[in-house]
Amino acid sequence: MALTLLGDEAGRACFAITRRQLHLGAHAGQWAIPGGRLEPGESPEAAALRELAEEVGVALDASAVLGRLDDFATRSGFVITPIVLWAERPVELVPNPQEVAHVYRVPLDVLEEPRVPELFSIPQSDRPVLSIPIEMLGTSIYAPTAAILFQLREVALYGRATRVAHYEQPKFAWR
């Protein structure tokens, strides 16, 4: 997963998030950070850089890698390795229409709003579901994406060592 930090026209620090195409088999229409499977012999960092270029047309090199957040095992059988990237220069986000319906720059300060994170329970699990309301998108983002964004907030913005693997995903994300 390419958790990419970049600027916007107003000079604010943002992260890039996509809305997946509706025709995709896995997680169609869901909100996601660019990412995908590792190619044989590929490191998570190389995969993040490749997927960022494939999904939103941003070509960065290895110097853009800031580090990793914790792996997140999903209910659908994937293990997400979040790689935090920094786009030092201005970049244009161009969604690949095969995979991405829309791509957005969301200011990092939305992660500091008082109601972030929101936690709720579901009957299928004893673990809390984590979500992050993002008003500019008109929706909430749910774990695993929300859990990873929450960890980014805690580690990068507040300097707190925070783990997120215990957060549950909503039932719709299990498939």
Task: Name these PLM-found stretches.
Residues 6-10, 21, 87-91, 108-109:
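Short loop segments at secondary-structure junctions
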Residues 12-54, 70, 132, 170:
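Conserved Nudix-box catalytic region and its N-terminal flanking loop in Nudix hydrolases
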Residues 2, 52, 107:
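Terminal peptide-recognition signature
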Residues 1-16:
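Conserved N-terminal beta-strand and adjoining loop/helix that marks the start
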Residues 42-87:
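Hydrophobic, well-structured mid-protein blocks that either form specific transmembrane helices
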Residues 65-82, 90-175:
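Nudix hydrolase/Nudix homology domain
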